[in-house]
C-alpha cells in the first residue's frame, strides 16, 4: 500500500514539475509584436523594461516597429505581424476593424481605448524670429511651414483639424476655414511621411515653424535642441489609441501590457517623455509641464462630428477637402 502511495506521489510531483516547466517555457517564449506610430519609441524603450520587471511581464519579449501611423495601419492589414497597435488616431485603428483584425469594441475599453493625449504645438527657431504665435500667423507671406503629409501621418491630420477647428472657433465659416487651409498648405515647404521625419527636417535647418505633437517639441528640447514652442490659445486635444489584435496568439499578455500602460507608473514614464497622461491623478501631478488651454476642443466638438465624419469629409484620398488642397499645391494623397 505504501509503495502504491509513493508511486502516486511521485507521479503527481512529476506531473506538477512538467506543468511548471511548460508554463515557464510558454512565458520565456512569449513575444509581443508592437506596431506604433513614429514618435513614442523613446517612451517604449523605458516602458517595456518596466513591464518586464512586473509579474505579468516576466519573460515577455518584444519586437517593435515605428513609422507613419497610416502606413503602419496599412502594413498590418498587408500582413505585418502585430499583437498590439499604438497609432496616432482612431481612423487608423478603425481601418484594422474593417479588415477584421481588431475588435469593433476596442474603444469601449478603459479610457475609450486611448493611452496618451497631446496637443498641437508650433515648434519655432530660437528667439522666434518670425514672431509666430497664432494660427493666422502661419498664413503670412514668407513663412515656411513644415507639416507632414496627412495621407501618411496621423499627426498631420491632427494638425489640420487643429487649424480648421480653431478658425471655425474664431467665427470663420466653413468656406473661409477651408480657404485658410489652402493658404496654410501654400506655405508648406516640406511634407514628410511622419511626425518624426518632419521634426528631423526642421532640426536640419529647414522651415520657420513645424506643426507637430507637444511631445515631439519636448523630446527635441530633452535632446538639447535649441528650439522653442508655442501652444496656440485655441487647440485640439490629440488622443492616441491602442488596441490588441484579434488574431494575436498572446492575447492575455497583450492585454496585460495594455493594463500596465495605464498604471500610474507607466503613465509617469509617458509624461517624462512629453505625453499627456490619460490617468487624471498623473496628469494633475504633472500640471506644471502640461499647461491647460481654455480654448482646447476635441474632434467631437465645434460641429466637427468626430472622426467618423471628419475622415471621409477631409481625408478621403479622392474626394476629401484636403485631397483637393493637396492637388492644388502639388502634394501627394497616398
Regions found by a protein language model. Give the residues of each.
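Ligand-binding pocket segment of bilobal, Venus flytrap-like solute-binding proteins
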Residues: 170-233, 241
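Ligand-binding cleft/hinge of the Venus flytrap
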Residues: 49-56, 136-196, 200
Amino acid at each position: 500500500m505504501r509503495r502504491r502511495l509513493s508511486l502516486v506521489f511521485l507521479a503527481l510531483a512529476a506531473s506538477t514539475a512538467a506543468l511548471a516547466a511548460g508554463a515557464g517555457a510558454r512565458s520565456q517564449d512569449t513575444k509581443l509584436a508592437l506596431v506604433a506610430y513614429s514618435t513614442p519609441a523613446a517612451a517604449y524603450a523605458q516602458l517595456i523594461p518596466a513591464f518586464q520587471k512586473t509579474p505579468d511581464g516576466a519573460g515577455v519579449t518584444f519586437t517593435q516597429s515605428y513609422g507613419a501611423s497610416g502606413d503602419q495601419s496599412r502594413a498590418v492589414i498587408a500582413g505585418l505581424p502585430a499583437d498590439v497597435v499604438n497609432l496616432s488616431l482612431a481612423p487608423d485603428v478603425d481601418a484594422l476593424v474593417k479588415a477584421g483584425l481588431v475588435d469593433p469594441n476596442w474603444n469601449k475599453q478603459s479610457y475609450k481605448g486611448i493611452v496618451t493625449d497631446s496637443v498641437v504645438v508650433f515648434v519655432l527657431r530660437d528667439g522666434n524670429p518670425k514672431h509666430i504665435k497664432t494660427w493666422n500667423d502661419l498664413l503670412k507671406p514668407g513663412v515656411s511651414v513644415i507639416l507632414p503629409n496627412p495621407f501618411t501621418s496621423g499627426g498631420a491630420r491632427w494638425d489640420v483639424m487643429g487649424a480648421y477647428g480653431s478658425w471655425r472657433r474664431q467665427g470663420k465659416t466653413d468656406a473661409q476655414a477651408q480657404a485658410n487651409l489652402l493658404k496654410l498648405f501654400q506655405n508648406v515647404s516640406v511634407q514628410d511621411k511622419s511626425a518624426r521625419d518632419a521634426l528631423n527636417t526642421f532640426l536640419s535647418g529647414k522651415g520657420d515653424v513645424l506643426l507637430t505633437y507637444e511631445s515631439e517639441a519636448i523630446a527635441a528640447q530633452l535632446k538639447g535642441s535649441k528650439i522653442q514652442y508655442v501652444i496656440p490659445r485655441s487647440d485640439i486635444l490629440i488622443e492616441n489609441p491602442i488596441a490588441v489584435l484579434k488574431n494575436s496568439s498572446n492575447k492575455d499578455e497583450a492585454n496585460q501590457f495594455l493594463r500596465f500602460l495605464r498604471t500610474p507608473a507607466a503613465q509617469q514614464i509617458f509624461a517624462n517623455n512629453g505625453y499627456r497622461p490619460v490617468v487624471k491623478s498623473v496628469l494633475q501631478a504633472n500640471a506644471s509641464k502640461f499647461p491647460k488651454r481654455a480654448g482646447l476642443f476635441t474632434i467631437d466638438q465645434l460641429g466637427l462630428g468626430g472622426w467618423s465624419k471628419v475622415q471621409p469629409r477631409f481625408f478621403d484620398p479622392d474626394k476629401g477637402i484636403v485631397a483637393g488642397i493637396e492637388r492644388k499645391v502639388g502634394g501627394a494623397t497616398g
